[in-house]
């Protein structure tokens, strides 16, 4: 695809953002685009139990392995405020995380290999439900990557607004944190504000729970390590002169290794049990990690990726640190070795998930060519 084709396609995708597992228009446009490519080497597959997902296999001429490339396809419940002439047509939904860029780069890579048969097999995975619903985990758990669709190594990108357009960046080890949703219900006894001895105040219990949770990172995580536990929602009480008999908390836990996350999850449960004993109340702690594991890059494959990027005179590569945001590609990289990397899209005054996020389309061609170059290099490596 030429740059003009990529831009046109990106703008079409940008106008039809859809939420997790609802990506019907997006799926249809992707399928139409892929069916318009040369079909000699392609096999297209849909998943009946995950109907907005799409897999495309490119048959290699002398395959020693199968390399996977993944892109996410869903959008966010955000009202777009970019002012672009090709802004979202769907009220209250926008590609505020740049998945339209991700899809366009993937289609550009696929179009190249549809015309230039690769040495190894390639499988492109157009994944629904990254922002929620664990789309990668859903596909893996239903056996999408078994048999003839087995993948030996997996790659994928995420756009990054604070890097110049076309810049590539990644690192050994963890790139994205793993995330866990925290839901806590505290159940005591309501009563008159003037008679606290006859009630069991869950606002006080909830405040104590939150305060104790804040000691977990400070005192259970080493000073050179990183983790975050944040509560962003608390509901309790109905009126000023009635003691709240119930409280509900919602928060998030984020860490850079699964071992650390498992430990912190247990500490949250332990504190919940302690609060229940201290305040003579019920504390129900629900932790949901789903498929949002840390994105941990494979050392061997990532070293190779970084070296290829650094050796490519057409690529600007920069080092990076891990980030506390989450990405469900972590689940797939927990099962299949691979590498995730950043693609700069030059929107430093905005950020991912912002209503005014507007990635620079100048990143499209460099993104496609850098990945094509890497994959062609990778296919020359012996298994």
Curated annotation (Swiss-Prot):
**Which Gene3D superfamilies does the entry link to?**
3.30.70.360, Zn peptidases
Q: Which GO terms describe its biological process?
A: diaminopimelate biosynthetic process; lysine biosynthetic process via diaminopimelate
- Protein EC: 3.5.1.47
Query: Catalytic residues per the record?
Result: 72, 131 (proton acceptor)
Q: Which UniProt keywords apply?
A: Amino-acid biosynthesis, Diaminopimelate biosynthesis, Hydrolase, Lysine biosynthesis
Which reactions fall under this protein's catalytic activity?
A: N-acetyl-(2S,6S)-2,6-diaminopimelate + H2O = (2S,6S)-2,6-diaminopimelate + acetate
The molecular function terms in GO held by this entry are: N-acetyldiaminopimelate deacetylase activity
- Pathway stated in the Swiss-Prot or TrEMBL entry: Amino-acid biosynthesis; L-lysine biosynthesis via DAP pathway; LL-2,6-diaminopimelate from (S)-tetrahydrodipicolinate (acetylase route): step 3/3
Entry similarity comment? Belongs to the peptidase M20A family. N-acetyldiaminopimelate deacetylase subfamily.
| General function of this protein | Catalyzes the conversion of N-acetyl-diaminopimelate to diaminopimelate and acetate.
What is the name attached to this protein's record? N-acetyldiaminopimelate deacetylase
């Amino acid at each position: 695809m030429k740059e003009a084709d990529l831009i046109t396609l990106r703008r079409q995708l940008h106008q039809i953002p859809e939420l997790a597992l609802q990506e019907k228009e997006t799926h249809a446009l992707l399928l139409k685009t892929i069916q318009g490519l040369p079909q000699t080497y392609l096999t297209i597959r849909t998943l009946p139990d995950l109907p907005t997902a799409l897999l495309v296999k490119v048959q290699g001429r002398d395959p020693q392995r199968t390399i996977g490339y993944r892109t996410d396809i869903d959008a966010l419940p955000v009202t777009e405020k970019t002012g672009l002439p090709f802004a979202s047509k769907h009220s209250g939904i926008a590609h505020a995380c740049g998945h339209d860029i991700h899809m366009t780069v993937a289609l550009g890579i696929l179009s190249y290999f549809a015309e230039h048969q690769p040495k190894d097999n390639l499988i492109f995975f157009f994944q629904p439900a990254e922002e929620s619903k664990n789309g990668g985990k859903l596909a893996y758990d239903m056996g999408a990557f078994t048999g003839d669709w087995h993948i030996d190594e997996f790659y994928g990108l995420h756009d990054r607004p604070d890097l110049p357009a076309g810049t590539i960046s990644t690192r050994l080890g963890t790139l994205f944190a793993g995330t866990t949703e925290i839901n806590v219900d505290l159940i005591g006894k309501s009563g008159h504000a003037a008679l606290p001895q006859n009630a069991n105040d869950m606002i006080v219990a909830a405040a104590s729970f939150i305060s104790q949770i804040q000691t977990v990172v400070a005192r259970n995580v080493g000073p050179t390590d990183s983790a975050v536990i944040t509560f962003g929602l608390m509901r309790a009480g109905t009126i000023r002169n009635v003691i709240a008999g119930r409280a509900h908390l919602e928060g998030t836990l984020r860490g850079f290794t699964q071992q650390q996350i498992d430990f912190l999850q247990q500490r949250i449960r332990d504190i919940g049990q302690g609060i229940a004993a201290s305040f003579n109340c019920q504390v129900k702690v629900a932790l949901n990690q789903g498929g949002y594991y840390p994105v941990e890059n494979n050392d061997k494959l990532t070293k190779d990726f970084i070296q290829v990027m650094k050796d490519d005179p057409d690529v600007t590569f920069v080092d990076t640190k891990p980030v506390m945001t989450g990405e469900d590609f972590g689940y797939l990289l927990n099962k299949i070795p691979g590498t995730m990397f950043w693609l700069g899209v030059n929107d430093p005054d905005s950020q991912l998930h912002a209503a005014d996020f507007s990635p620079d389309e100048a990143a499209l061609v460099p993104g496609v060519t850098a990945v094509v170059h890497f994959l062609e290099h990778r296919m020359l490596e012996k298994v």
